[in-house]
A protein has these predicted regions:
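Primarily recognizes the serine-hydrolase "nucleophile elbow" in alpha/beta-hydrolase
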Residues: 135-179
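C-terminal catalytic histidine-bearing segment of alpha/beta-hydrolase fold enzymes
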Residues: 186, 192-245
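Active-site machinery of serine-nucleophile hydrolases
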Residues: 67, 74-118
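A domain-start/cap signature at the N-terminus of enzymes
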Residues: 27-67, 140-142, 147, 152, ...
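Gly/Ser-rich "nucleophile elbow"/oxyanion-hole loop immediately N-terminal to the catalytic nucleophile
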Residues: 58-63, 111-143, 157
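The conserved beta1-alpha1 loop
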Residues: 71-72, 187
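Bacterial N-terminal signal peptides that target proteins for export
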Residues: 2-15
């Protein structure tokens, strides 16, 4: 990764989710042969993500900085972090762009999709080791990463100050969980890979919950609505204006 920004480094972290299942079986005694039993089982899911880490100028591990999580699309899956620099903030950083916040850009393994619980655990681990302003954590993603942004925001809406899914979609239940959280949605009107209706459905679900999402539709854009979105400095200004109170 010699052609990568010196501030953007590749790291690997295992995100482990421990799920406890407890089954309590209570017997209604009919005779002495019926007893009360308790069964407990503990299972562990492990997700392993390589990711790019960008630390802004002035980061010294003491002063807390905002954090942006970027989720790439399906075409950048694999085990080569250079793929992650193809689009979005990692591409801009690679080309010399400086941001006033931390950026982490994980890579999804081949053949799978973003898992919200794995990403949530990744953030837990990262935040525990870095000076992060927990009131200013943001998530954005494109295509498959747009779906991941909706899913992660729905899983843990209290974590994020704002979300920006691009040409994505998802489960309207996630939109209901996100509710009034600041969200800026982007989509191309001529997208034949993920139709505009996917974002429209999620935006409408937010509105039904009292949300006031921003919704930018690029009338001439196909699936690539992310280049224009991520090249827009107003997106990052908007992110930084959002804070959990």
């Amino acid at each position: 990764m010699n052609n990568m920004s010196l501030h953007q480094t590749g790291l690997k972290q295992a995100a482990t989710i421990t799920v406890c299942f407890l089954l309590l079986k209570t017997a209604i005694a009919a005779d002495l042969n019926q007893t009360k039993e308790t069964f407990s089982s503990k299972t562990t899911k492990t997700y392993s993500y390589s990711y790019l880490k960008y630390l802004p100028d002035g980061y010294d591990g003491k002063k807390e900085f905002p954090l942006l999580l970027f989720l790439h699309g399906a075409g950048e899956r694999g085990d080569n972090l250079e793929l992650v620099t193809k689009h979005g903030p990692p591409k801009l950083i690679k080309n010399g762009k400086k941001f006033p916040f931390i950026v982490i850009s994980p890579q999804c393994p081949k053949g799978v999709w973003w898992k919200a619980d794995g990403l949530d655990a990744l953030l837990d681990g990262f935040i525990s080791k870095h000076a992060v302003d927990r009131s200013r954590i943001y998530c954005t993603g494109l295509s498959m990463g747009g779906f991941g942004t909706w899913a992660l925001g729905g899983l843990n809406p209290k974590r994020f100050a704002a979300l920006a899914p691009i040409c994505g979609g998802g489960n309207s239940i996630d939109a209901r969980h996100i509710g009034k959280k600041p969200v800026w949605v982007f989509h191309g009107a001529k997208d034949k890979v993920i139709p505009l209706t996917e974002s429209e459905r999620m935006v409408n679900a937010l509105k039904r919950r009292g949300g006031k999402p921003k919704f930018t539709i690029y009338p001439e854009a196909g699936h690539d609505s992310w280049t224009e979105a991520y090249n827009n400095p107003k997106l990052y200004e908007w992110f930084l204006s959002q804070k959990i109170k």
